[in-house]
């Protein structure tokens, strides 16, 4: 398959993962606002899907890396994809922590603070998506 097409698919996978994680954080915000209650189980399911996507993306990056040395733009996209998948793997746990916290927290001020953190993560992911 053409290298550009494979790199484009990889980029789309990373962007899709960012969108999935944004959705996960939005669920946590809804929980924190007590508007649309979602169970921690649903957040954990999303975590598992993100983990599988990270593994797939990292596998594709490793497979494509030796082929793209002469093409700086393609190499840059692969490196960004690899970095993003690494960061997202670490970020995904925060949504679960927020969901568990929302289940038990009675302190309104603290809940608002966590909600702001979740919004900040979504903003960061939107910026990452824009980098492509």
Give the location of each predicted region:
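Cytosolic, long alpha-helical scaffolding segments
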Residues: 1-132
């Amino acid at each position: 398959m053409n290298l550009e097409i494979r790199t484009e698919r990889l980029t789309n996978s990373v962007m899709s993962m960012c969108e999935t994680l944004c959705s996960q954080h939005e669920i946590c915000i809804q929980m924190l606002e007590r508007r649309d209650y979602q169970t921690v189980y649903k957040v954990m399911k999303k975590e598992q899907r993100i983990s599988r996507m990270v593994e797939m993306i990292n596998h594709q990056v490793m497979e494509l890396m030796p082929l793209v040395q002469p093409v700086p733009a393609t190499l840059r996209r692969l490196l960004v994809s690899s970095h993003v998948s690494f960061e997202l793997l670490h970020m995904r746990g925060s949504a679960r922590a927020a969901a568990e916290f929302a289940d038990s927290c009675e302190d309104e001020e603290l809940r608002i603070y966590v909600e702001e953190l979740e919004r900040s993560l979504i903003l960061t992911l939107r910026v990452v998506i824009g980098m492509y």
